[in-house]
C-alpha cells in the first residue's frame, strides 16, 4: 500500500493563564503589599549616623485576574510506504484575552507607575510541519526527521484615550505585530565628503554633526528635507518605517540517527531561517 495512515484532527480549548511577562508572586497578587524597611540606608546623616528608611508599596489593582487563552488547532497525520514515511502538520490560532499589557499612561501628578492591568487581547497564529523517514537495510537501521515551524503574534485590542493615529509606535496598538523594528532607511555609506555634503542638502539628519566619508546616508522619506523621527506616533513617525521584526521566523530542526549491530549514532541540527536584529 502507498498510503497506510491518514488521520485528520481538530481541537478547541480554553484555559486560564498566569504564565506571562509578569511571573512573580508580587505581580499576580498585587493586593498583598508590604512596606519596605531598610536599616541605615538613608542618604542623609542625623547626629553623624545614617537613618532607617521606609518606602510605600506600589498602587494596588484589585481587578487583575488570570488571562484567558483560547486555542483552535487543525492538522493531519499520515504514513506511507509501510509507514517508513511519516508526517504531521498543524495549524493553530491562540487568542489571549484580557492579557496583562503595558499599563496606561497616567498623569505625572500620580507620582508613581500605574498598576498592571488586564487591558488587551493578542492572537498568535502559526503552523508546524514534521516529516520523517525510517528504514532498515539488513542489519543497518537509519532514520531522518525534519521539522519546520513558524508563528506571529498580533495585538488585537489595546485601550487608548484619543485618536488611534496618535498612539506611540513604541507601545502597544491595535494591529501591531510583536517585536516590530522601526528604523531609518539608508542608501549606503558615503564614499567621500563631497558625496555626503551633496546628500545632506536634501537628506539632513536632525542629530549628529561633522558628517563625512564612511558615514551612513539616511533617506528622507516624507520629503521635508530633514531626517527625523517626527512625533514617534502612527500618524507622525517622520522618516521612520518598519524595517523588520525581531521575532524568530521559520525554526528548523533536523535529526539523523543510525544503528548497526549494537552501535548507534545520532545527531541533530536546529536553527532559525529568518530573524531581524537591531542594536
Residue ranges and their predicted role:
Residues 83-87, 139-140, 262-267:
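Repeated loop/turn-to-beta-strand initiation elements of outer-membrane beta-barrel proteins
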Residues 143, 245-273:
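Conserved C-terminal beta-signal and adjacent last beta-strands/turns
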Residues 1, 10, 74-78, 89, ...:
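Residues on the lipid-exposed face of transmembrane beta-strands in outer-membrane beta-barrel proteins
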Residues 23-29, 117-120, 136-244, 277:
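Conserved small-residue
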Residues 39-86, 115-137, 175-189, 245-250:
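Outer-membrane beta-barrel signature, preferentially recognizing the C-terminal barrel domain
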Residues 19-20, 182, 266-268, 275-277:
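Short helix/loop capping segments that flank catalytic or ligand/cofactor-binding pockets
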Residues 2-67, 86, 90-122, 159:
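Solvent-exposed loop/turn elements at secondary-structure boundaries
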Residues 12-16, 91-97, 133-135, 148-154, ...:
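Transmembrane beta-strands of outer-membrane beta-barrel pores
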Amino acid at each position: 500500500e502507498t498510503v497506510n495512515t491518514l488521520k485528520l484532527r481538530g481541537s478547541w480549548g480554553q484555559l486560564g493563564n498566569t504564565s506571562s511577562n509578569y511571573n512573580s508572586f508580587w505581580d499576580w497578587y498585587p493586593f498583598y503589599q508590604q512596606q519596605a524597611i531598610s536599616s541605615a540606608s538613608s542618604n542623609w546623616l542625623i547626629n553623624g549616623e545614617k537613618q532607617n528608611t521606609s518606602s510605600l508599596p506600589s498602587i494596588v489593582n484589585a481587578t487583575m485576574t488570570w488571562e484567558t487563552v483560547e486555542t483552535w488547532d487543525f492538522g493531519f497525520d499520515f504514513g506511507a510506504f509501510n509507514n517508513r514515511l511519516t508526517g504531521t502538520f498543524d495549524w493553530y490560532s491562540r487568542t489571549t484575552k484580557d492579557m496583562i499589557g503595558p499599563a496606561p499612561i497616567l498623569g505625572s501628578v500620580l507620582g508613581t507607575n500605574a498598576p498592571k492591568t488586564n487591558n488587551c487581547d493578542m492572537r498568535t497564529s502559526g503552523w508546524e510541519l514534521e516529516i520523517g523517514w525510517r528504514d532498515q537495510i539488513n542489519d543497518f537501521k537509519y532514520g531522518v526527521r525534519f521539522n519546520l515551524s513558524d508563528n506571529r503574534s498580533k495585538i488585537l485590542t489595546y485601550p487608548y484615550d484619543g485618536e488611534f493615529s496618535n498612539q506611540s509606535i513604541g507601545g502597544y496598538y491595535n494591529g501591531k505585530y510583536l517585536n516590530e523594528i522601526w528604523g531609518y532607511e539608508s542608501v549606503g555609506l558615503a564614499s567621500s565628503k563631497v558625496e555626503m555634503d551633496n546628500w545632506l542638502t536634501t537628506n539632513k539628519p536632525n542629530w549628529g554633526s561633522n558628517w563625512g566619508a564612511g558615514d551612513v546616508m539616511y533617506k528622507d522619506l516624507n520629503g521635508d528635507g530633514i531626517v527625523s523621527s517626527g512625533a514617534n506616533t502612527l500618524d507622525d513617525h517622520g522618516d521612520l518605517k518598519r524595517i523588520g521584526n525581531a521575532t524568530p521566523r521559520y525554526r528548523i530542526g533536523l535529526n539523523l540517527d543510525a544503528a548497526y549491530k549494537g552501535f548507534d549514532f545520532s545527531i541533530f541540527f536546529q536553527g532559525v531561517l529568518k530573524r531581524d536584529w537591531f542594536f
